[in-house]
């Protein structure tokens, strides 16, 4: 199967660069699946999971806090404020941050910061999904 070059960059560092068979990411208008030779595209992406298949068939998962996706026929670039490999996520820290976000939503009720609190909770849930998906992928490799 054909491949293309994928680069995932956070504000701090390059997280991944290599040849992949496909990538799945959530754009602002829905889910995107990118294969080699895809039509050029530039779109914002939502906080969530970037899942891609390596040349050897193994899959990897990276959490992104949102950002931009640029697609060229043989090159795909993800630019994110924050990007963390699923294998580097800490489940305990995620659960604690999720719990605090839920408590803040309940305690503040209809406060003006409600949308920000919901966005924080959504990011923690996306991190949790990235962690769980990574764990599942690691178990299937064993």
Swiss-Prot record:
UniProt KW Cell wall biogenesis/degradation keyword: no
Keywords: ATP synthesis, Cell inner membrane, Cell membrane, CF(1), Hydrogen ion transport, Ion transport, Membrane, Transport
Domain of life: Bacteria
InterPro entries reported in the protein's UniProt record: ATP_F1_dsu/esu_C_sf, ATP_synth_F1_dsu/esu, ATP_synth_F1_dsu/esu_N, ATPsynth_dsu/esu_N
UniProt topology in membrane: Peripheral membrane protein
Entry's family note: Belongs to the ATPase epsilon chain family.
NCBIfam families reported in the protein's UniProt record: ATP_synt_epsi, PRK00571.1-4
This protein's name: ATP synthase epsilon chain
Gene transcribed to yield this protein: atpC
